[in-house]
Every structure is written in structure tokens, then in C-alpha cells.
């Protein structure tokens, strides 16, 4: 939620959700509440109490997990409370950023956070990091000159924006917008109008709960009517109907799903993914499109030198040799004409300049030693209009001015070129070769700078007039390279039937180059810019997105439209982002993924998952976990429904055969809540299988209750129901209802404990192995068996559970019939492979 504070320069205020209330919105939980009320009305206080305990446990589990995730989020937040330097009464004073108002004149220097939107009045090499708004970490050079036309935010160089900060230089700006009237405020407005989506599992469980409730009501009504028509007492008919309802409702399902998802979040947290919204764990398994930011997610978020062009040769960075005089000169000159430093591994300065220092460090050239040997005495700072930077140094053999900057600008000031160890007048052929290489580098998405120099006989304070008659030394080409694991992650993505899409604020050429290198893009025709989207209707965009893999120079509005277009085509969409500009799309996506390291507070609050390593590959691991969790939840549901179906069949059969009600409600609740829950949880924690990533995402509308699934439930429930009815008939041969109920209860309980092994996988574990690969299942079986034994063997419990002591022969019958049910189902799985 977003609130606006009047009169103050404040944008968004995060409000915690009603975490406990959210746990009671699930449809199955509502069914349990109704069943508890009915049980209480019929005098079954024990049943009602147990059901209410289950509901409360489920709410506590969900709330605790969500709070833990929220606390993990809090540990990632590093909130800034900036002050601002403004002109008040003719003097520059510091005031809290929230007190700034339109019309204030604000002074900026390196390290300052920009507290409001404004028009630049003065710029002394002012450079601003706008990555929170544009997603691009390279600083933007600010100017005071007017600009014309409608420009994207990243190109409005005479404006500064709230949410960004100064990385270099100084400046002054006039405040033109505060609070909700800033770019951040506009994004906050978009967040208001973006609703969160339910995951496929939530939708499936809602549908399942509604269908199940209708089936239960219908069966109860039919059974009640049959009993009354047969002349039975209304009270007895009601008892049959209640027994059927209790047998049919999987009371523990909601708790089991919550526990399985919670365990999944723990595993994913160890792999670098913090889950803020529990249901998102499974939602990841349904993802069919991943819209990823480029900078820092697919790339290293660290500018790196890729190539040198020296002495007429292209030299890849890994082949640069400091033993070569010209290459050594390039390394040293790029360090000298440079303001960045590397202090104990911490890079300080402009990313393009730190790339030069880092390369020198890799090649064994210390920046500090080079600078100490060739001290700087004067400089001409970089200017965005001039596009050059020059520094003046005392060398062993005299004085040298080193100049670096845009290639086209530098070539106009070059008169000479260094080849080998000699200097020659530059020729048209030399210029053509340099321009050709520069164009090749640029088309590959590389940022290119030229390095030149000029010797002076004496020391002087250089000026722009001295930036003439330069000797061209070479080109250096750099980029923010892909993460080493990005290409493999994209390949895994495609193998899993997931479409990877890059959405970035960077330029199209750069984005396309990175996308090609990691396998997202096959052809440049699959890349477009945000301005192309502006002229499209929603219907046109829905068709357009299918063929586009890279979107460049996009706005927050573009991102939302792209996500919605994919969703309109029936896809489950994951969206990554780290900036304030990403927040609306993160919320719109089915699964919003924020960056934990570089992400802003607003982005993290809008997301359902946070990556602690900002790595695209971690998303793929999370998708794999989500798919495995869904498969395991299906196994748990299959286990619960087949066991409940067995109990339903026995109750209906007893009614049709004019036999007493086979189970007391407490029998079924004991089974459903204890001996059933443990194996179901164990199934939810089955070992993960990597083969899930070799399949396409399941269809969005695919129900859990598929034809094949229902057949398995029906067959397995029928087998278990048959042996339970047999046990009931054996116990009832002398008309002893308590003995019959005890044997039916014991066989149903033990058969369902063994049935956990039947549901482990598609293969029969007895014949093919895998019986002992899940320690949770061993613990579940032993725990359930001990609980059943205690109920049957401890006399003080007999009254509460409506059972009696079994003789040796009766116990053997219980064990034998339970074992038969498992062997029959395992045999059917081996023969029919259902």
C-alpha cells in the first residue's frame, strides 16, 4: 500500500500486510471451519476441537513463515535518510530531505542523494547514478543547456531525479517536483493500480476445495436419504452422513501444503532465494516466461576491458602483454588519466575508469606505483560537451599530457600515430582503420574510448587549447560482461520450455550484444526499443511480444504492458528487477523477483522473491525447486485423497449392507490428522529430481484432478477400501460393533501408513528400489505405527478412541490385510504403470 504525506517531500510508506488474516482465506480452510461448526452442533466436541486446532496450526505456520521472510527482507534494507543543502535566506544550509519544496535551489556534490526532481542550473562535471530509475549503473553526465523534444528519462541530461545520487563533480538544481510528483512518485502511483496474482496452485486448490465440498454435500445427502428410506432412524442417518463428511474432508491438507512450501523456502534460501510470499514457491514451478533485467542479473554489473586496439592490431584482454612496450604504455596511460582507485578490493570511482585500473592490477601493474612514479600536476576534467579528459604528468624524460575520450572527437585532434616504437604522421588510411575498428566494437555492444598523448618540454597548467596535435596510442573497448553462469542458465531455461526475455533501460545495440552472447537473442530483428511499443494497442502488443526477446530503453509503463501481454497469452510470468522503476512490473508479474544486493527498498517490497546473489542462475534453481515442490504436493494430495476415498467406500458399503457405521469420527480424525499427515508431509519432502527441467511448464489451467490422477486415486482407494471392509466384516462376525470398528480403524490406519510408499513415485518401490531414499518417510511410518500401537495397547485410551484390545489372531489379520493392500497396489503399478 502507498500513502502520501501532504506538504512533505515523501513518496511511499510500506505498510505490513495482515499476515494472520491472510491464512484464513483459503477455501479448504473455510470448509474445515464449517465442518467444525457442524461437529459442534451434533455434540461431537472432540472432533470440533481437533479441527479447530488444525486450522490454528495452519494459520500459525503460514504466519511464522511469512514473518521470517519479512524479517529477512528487513535485514537487506539499508535505508538512507538524506539531508540536502539548499539556499535559504541567501545562505546554503542543511535541512532534512523531507522539508524540501518546489522552488528550492539545491547544491550537490559527489556522494549526495538527490532528494527531488529538478532542472540543472550549474554543472561542474556533474555525473549522476540513475540506476534505481533506469536500471543502468553507468553514470549520466548532467548539463545545464536546454534540450528539445520528448526524451526518455535516461536522456534527460539537464534534469536530476529523486532516487538517484551524485557519483562525481558538483552541481546546482532548481526543485521542480517533490513527493508523488517525482519519477518515484509516478511509479508509486502505478503500484496502486497493480494487483497481485494468485499462483496456479492457489487457483487449483480453490477449485479443488469447491468441487470437493459439492461432492461431499451430494454424497452426504444421498446417504442420509438412503438411510431414511430404508426405515432407519433420522439420528442414525445423520451419524452416517457426518461420518462420511469427516471421512471425505482432508483436514490436514492446508497444513501439509503450508509445511511443504515452508520447507521449500528453507532450501531455496540456502541457494540464494528468499521467499516473501509462501505460495510463490510453487508459482515458480509454473513459470513459462522470465523477463529479466540485464545489468547485474545477466551481467556482472562491473565494467571490464574486453579489447585493446594498439599498433594496428586487435588484442583481446586476456592476451594483453605488459612486456610489450606499446601495450604496457596503454595500461599505464589509462591508469594515469584516471580518477578511480581500488582500496583493499573496494572500487571507488566511475565504472569505466575502475575497469582500467582493474585490468592493470590483473596484469601486475599497480595503480599507486604508476601514479607515484608519474605524478599529476594539472588536469582538465571530463566534460560531457567536450567528451574528453586530460591529465598532465611529470615523466622520466619530460612532461606528458594524456588524453582519453570519445573516438570521433579525439581523431579530430590527432596529428600523429604511434606504431611500434616510432611516431608517424597520421594518414587517412590510419583514420579509416581506427574508425572501422571503432564501429566493429560499437556494433558488438562495447563502449570504446581512445587514448592519446602529447609531450611538453616544460611543466604547465594545461587548458583545452592544449588538446591538439595529439599522438594516437590506441583504443580500449569495454562492457559489463555476462556472468559466467548466465549462458548455461539461459540454456537450462530453454530446455525447461521457459522463454527468457531481456528488458533493460540500456541501448539496443548493447543489450542485443549481451543477449546474443548468452543465447537469449538469435537475430537483431528480435530486439526493439520502448518507443516502438508506444504506438501499439494492447492487442497489437499481445501479438508482438511472441517474436521479441530484447526490449531496450523501456519505461516502467512499458514493462507493465510487456508483462501483461505475456499473461494475456496464457503465460505465467516471472519478472526481475532492482530499481524503483521495476516495482510496478514486479507486482504485476505472477512471480516478482527483486535483487537483494543492488535492489531498492521499493523493488523488494513489490517482489515475492528476493535473490541474495542477484544472479539469473538462481532463478532457474528456484524454478526447479518450484516444479519439484508441486510434484511432491501432488503426491501428498494423491495419498490423502486415495485414503479418504477408501474410508468413503467403506462407509457407503456399510450403509448399503445395513451394517453399523464402521468408524467413529474420532477414528477418522486420528487418521487424517496424525497417521495421514506424517506420510503426506514426508511425500512433500521427497528428494528433488533434476528431470523436471526437461519438461515444458504445465498448462496454467491444468487441474490437479486430471483423469489419470483420479484413476490412480480411485484404484488405490478401492484396494484399501476392500481390505478395510474385509477387516470390518471379520470383526463383526459375532455382532461386536466395537471389535469391528477397531479392526477397520487399525487396517485403515496401517494401510494408509504403508500407502505412503505407494505414492512415492511412478515406479513400484518394492520392485525397483527407492524404498529407503527418504528418511522423512521412515520417520513418518515409525511414528504413525507407534501412535497406532499406543491407541490399541493402552487401555486408558480405549474409551476416548472407541476401540478395544485385539487378540493375536486379530492383530495378525490387521497386519496381513494391510500388507496385502500394499502388495496389490505395488503389483498394479508394476504391471499397469498407472
Where do the model's predicted regions map?
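Generic alpha-helical transmembrane segments
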Residues: 675, 720, 742-756
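Alpha-helix capping/termination and helix-coil
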Residues: 338, 570, 623, 627, ...
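Membrane-water interface at loop-to-transmembrane-helix junctions
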Residues: 699-718, 738-742
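Helix-coil boundary and interhelical linker segments in multi-pass alpha-helical membrane proteins
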Residues: 655-664, 728-740
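Conserved cytosolic headpiece of P-type ATPases
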Residues: 1-694, 704-705, 718, 745, ...
Amino acid at each position: 500500500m502507498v500513502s502520501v504525506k501532504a506538504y512533505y517531500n515523501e513518496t511511499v510508506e510500506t505498510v505490513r500486510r495482515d499476515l494472520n488474516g491472510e491464512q484464513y482465506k483459503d477455501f479448504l480452510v473455510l470448509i474445515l471451519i464449517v465442518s467444525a461448526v457442524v461437529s459442534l452442533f451434533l455434540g461431537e466436541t472432540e472432533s470440533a476441537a481437533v479441527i479447530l486446532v488444525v486450522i490454528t496450526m495452519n494459520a500459525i505456520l503460514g504466519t511464522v513463515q511469512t514473518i521470517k521472510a519479512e524479517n529477512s527482507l528487513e535485514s537487506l534494507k539499508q535505508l538512507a535518510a538524506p539531508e540536502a543543502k539548499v539556499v535559504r535566506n541567501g545562505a546554503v544550509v542543511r535541512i532534512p530531505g523531507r522539508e524540501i519544496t518546489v522552488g528550492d535551489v539545491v547544491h550537490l556534490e559527489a556522494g549526495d542523494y538527490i532528494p527531488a526532481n529538478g532542472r540543472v542550473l550549474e554543472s561542474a562535471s556533474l555525473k549522476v547514478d540513475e540506476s534505481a530509475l533506469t536500471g543502468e549503473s553507468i553514470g549520466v553526465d548532467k548539463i545545464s543547456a536546454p534540450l528539445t523534444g520528448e526524451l526518455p528519462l535516461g536522456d534527460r541530461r539537464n534534469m536530476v531525479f529523486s532516487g538517484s545520487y551524485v557519483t562525481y563533480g558538483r552541481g546546482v538544481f532548481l526543485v521542480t517536483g517533490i513527493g508523488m510528483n517525482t519519477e518515484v512518485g509516478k511509479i508509486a502511483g502505478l503500484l496502486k493500480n497493480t494487483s497481485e496474482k494468485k499462483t496456479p496452485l492457489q487457483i487449483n486448490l480453490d477449485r479443488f476445495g469447491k468441487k470437493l465440498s459439492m461432492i461431499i454435500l451430494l454424497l452426504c445427502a444421498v446417504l442420509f436419504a438412503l438411510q431414511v428410506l430404508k426405515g432407519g432412524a433420522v439420528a442414525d442417518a445423520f451419524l452416517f452422513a457426518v461420518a462420511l463428511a469427516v471421512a471425505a474432508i482432508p483436514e490436514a491438507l492446508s497444513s501439509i501444503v503450508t509445511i511443504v512450501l515452508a520447507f521449500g523456502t528453507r532450501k531455496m534460501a540456502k541457494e540464494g532465494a528468499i521467499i516473501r510470499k509462501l505460495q510463490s514457491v510453487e508459482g515458480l514451478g509454473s513459470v513459462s516466461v522470465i523477463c529479466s533485467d540485464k545489468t547485474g542479473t545477466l551481467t556482472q554489473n562491473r565494467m571490464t576491458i574486453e579489447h585493446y586496439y594498439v599498433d594496428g592490431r586487435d588484442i583481446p584482454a586476456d592476451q594483453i602483454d605488459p612486456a610489450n612496450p606499446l601495450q604496457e604504455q596503454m595500461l599505464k596511460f589509462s591508469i594515469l588519466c584516471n580518477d578511480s582507485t581500488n582500496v583493499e578490493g573496494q572500487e571507488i570511482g566511475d565504472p569505466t575508469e575502475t575497469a582500467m585500473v582493474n585490468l592493470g592490477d590483473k596484469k601486475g601493474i599497480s595503480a599507486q606505483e604508476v601514479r607515484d612514479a608519474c605524478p599529476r600536476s594539472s588536469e582538465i576534467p571530463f566534460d560531457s560537451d567536450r567528451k574528453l579528459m586530460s591529465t598532465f604528468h611529470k615523466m622520466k624524460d619530460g612532461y606528458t599530457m594524456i588524453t582519453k575520450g570519445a573516438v570521433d572527437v579525439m581523431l579530430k585532434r590527432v596529428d600523429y600515430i604511434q606504431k611500434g616504437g616510432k611516431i608517424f604522421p597520421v594518414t587517412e588510411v590510419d583514420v579509416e582503420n581506427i574508425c572501422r575498428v571503432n564501429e566493429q566494437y560499437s556494433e558488438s555492444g562495447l563502449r570504446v574510448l581512445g587514448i592519446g598523448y602529447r609531450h611538453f618540454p616544460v611543466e604547465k597548467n594545461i587548458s583545452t587549447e592544449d588538446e591538439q596535435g595529439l599522438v594516437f596510442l590506441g583504443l580500449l573497448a569495454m562492457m559489463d560482461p555476462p556472468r559466467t553462469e548466465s549462458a548455461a542458465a539461459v540454456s537450462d531455461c530453454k530446455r525447461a520450455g521457459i522463454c527468457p526475455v531481456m528488458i533493460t533501460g540500456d541501448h539496443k545495440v548493447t543489450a542485443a550484444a549481451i543477449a546474443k552472447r548468452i543465447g537469449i537473442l538469435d537475430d537483431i530483428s528480435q530486439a526493439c526499443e520502448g518507443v516502438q511499443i508506444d504506438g501499439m494497442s494492447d492487442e497489437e502488443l499481445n501479438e508482438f511480444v511472441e517474436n521479441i526477446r530484447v526490449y531496450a530503453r523501456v519505461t516502467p509503463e512499458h514493462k507493465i504492458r510487456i508483462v501483461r501481454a505475456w499473461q494475456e497469452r496464457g503465460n505465467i510470468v516471472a519478472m526481475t528487477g532492482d530499481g524503483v522503476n521495476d516495482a510496478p512490473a514486479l507486482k504485476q508479474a505472477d512471480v516478482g523477483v527483486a535483487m537483494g544486493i543492488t535492489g531498492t527498498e521499493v523493488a523488494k517490497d513489490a517482489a515475492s522473491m528476493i535473490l541474495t546473489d542477484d544472479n539469473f542462475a538462481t532463478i532457474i534453481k528456484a524454478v526447479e525447486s518450484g516444479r519439484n515442490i508441486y510434484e511432491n504436493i501432488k503426491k501428498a494430495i494423491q495419498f490423502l485423497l486415495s485414503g479418504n476415498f477408501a474410508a468413503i467406500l467403506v462407509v457407503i458399503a456399510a450403509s448399503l449392507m445395513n451394517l453399523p457405521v464402521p468408524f467413529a469420527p474420532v477414528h477418522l480424525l486420528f487418521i487424517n490428522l496424525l497417521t495421514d499427515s506424517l506420510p503426506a508431509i514426508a511425500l512433500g519432502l521427497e528428494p528433488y529430481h533434476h528431470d523436471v527441467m526437461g519438461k515444458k511448464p504445465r498448462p496454467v489451467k491444468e487441474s490437479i484432478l486430471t483423469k489419470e490422477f483420479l484413476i490412480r486415486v480411485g484404484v488405490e482407494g478401492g484396494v484399501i477400501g476392500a481390505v478395510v471392509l474385509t477387516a470390518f466384516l471379520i470383526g463383526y462376525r459375532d455382532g461386536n460393533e466395537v471389535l469391528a470398528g477397531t479392526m477397520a480403524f487399525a487396517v485403515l490406519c496401517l494401510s494408509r501408513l504403508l500407502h505412503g510408499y505407494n505414492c512415492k513415485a511412478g515406479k513400484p518401490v518394492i520392485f525397483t528400489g527407492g524404498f529407503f531414499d527418504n528418511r522423512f518417510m521412515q520417520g513418518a511410518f515409525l511414528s504413525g505405527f507407534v501412535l497406532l500401537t499406543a491407541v490399541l495397547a493402552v487401555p486408558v485410551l480405549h474409551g476416548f478412541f472407541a476401540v478395544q484390545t485385539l487378540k493375536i489372531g486379530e492383530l495378525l489379520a490387521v497386519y496381513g490385510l494391510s500388507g496385502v493392500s500394499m502388495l496389490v497396489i505395488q503389483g498394479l503399478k508394476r504391471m499397469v504403470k498407472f
